[in-house]
A protein has these predicted regions:
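A structured beta-alpha segment of the ubiquitous adenosine-cofactor-binding alpha/beta core
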Residues: 1-13
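Short, surface-exposed connector motifs at secondary-structure boundaries
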Residues: 10-17, 74-77, 181-187
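ALDH superfamily catalytic-core signature
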Residues: 25-160
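Short, well-ordered beta-strand elements within core beta-sheets of diverse protein domains
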Residues: 82-83, 161-171, 186-191
Length: 268
């Protein structure tokens, strides 16, 4: 009964577009009601941003991007971190430091999921340390890091207070793009690299409507465009308006967006 009014609204055939904010089963159910009524619908679906650190990545810039992408859990929060194997020895440590710092900022421990193929790149004490992790039901004692299957890189971590991220070490930026296109929600992607040509290849090959070179939390209508955001163009059932973008109250157009961030310390 508590949801009857929402079902009635989404099923009203006078609607030109039904926008269901958020994600999860409740949002999917609202979308199903709208679609059954023949209404166009925009659902956020699965979120989670990816950051890829290439061979020319600056460790400090990468760490800043990670830290500022983990201030809170929303759809544009960093979810999956890819580091190329040739830089793993010098990029994994600052990544772990940034993840730890993001947790300390919130007064909690972080949670790390490591692709099975990449376990050897993370210090063993991350896997043996059992720490309180802030969950919805309260603090739960868990290993600070746990392995996951390489097929689970796109799983979105719906964390409460403890920043939760997947780490995978990849052969190349091109391979990371392949994994993104195959496993990610194809939402937000950021490349950390000082190679201009690599950025151009990245933009051409990655199937993401939002592409950047720093922190991922810029993907927001109010923050990036100064416009009231109704929602994000649908990626739950394909792109609603072509390539996707931000739905605002003053425009029905949707374009692919790219940010070139000059200050690596920008955050929200």
């Amino acid at each position: 009964a508590s949801r009857a009014s929402a079902w009635a609204l989404m099923g009203d055939t006078r609607l030109a577009l039904a926008v269901a904010r958020g994600s999860g089963r409740a949002t999917a159910q609202l979308g199903a009601v709208a679609r059954q009524a023949g209404n166009a619908v925009s659902l956020h679906g699965t979120g989670g941003a990816w950051i890829i650190a290439g061979p020319d990545a600056d460790p400090t810039d990468m760490a800043s991007a990670v830290y500022h992408s983990l201030d809170r859990k929303v759809c544009n929060t960093l979810n999956t971190m890819c580091i190329t194997a040739d830089r793993a020895d010098d990029l994994v440590p600052p990544f772990l430091h940034a993840l730890t710092a993001a947790g300390k900022r919130r007064g909690v421990n972080p949670k790390l999921h490591v692709a099975a193929s990449s376990i050897g790149h993370v210090p063993s004490d991350w896997f043996t340390a059992v720490v309180p992790v802030a969950r919805a039901e309260g603090a739960v004692d868990e290993p600070m890091a746990e392995p996951i299957d390489d097929s689970d890189l796109g799983v979105e971590w719906e964390w409460e207070d403890s920043p939760e991220v997947t780490l995978v070490v990849v052969d190349s930026v091109d391979y990371a793009v392949e994994r993104f296109n195959a496993q990610a929600p194809r939402f937000v992607a950021s490349l950390i690299s000082s190679d201009a040509e690599e950025h151009e290849r990245f933009f051409r090959s990655i199937d993401a409507p939002f592409v950047g070179n720093g922190f991922t939390r810029w993907v927001d209508g109010q923050y990036a465009l100064g416009k009231p955001e109704l929602g994000l163009s649908n990626w739950e059932h394909g792109r609603l308006f072509g390539r996707s973008g931000i739905l605002s109250g003053d425009s029905a157009f949707s374009v692919r967006m790219r940010v070139e961030q000059s200050d690596p310390d920008v955050g929200r």
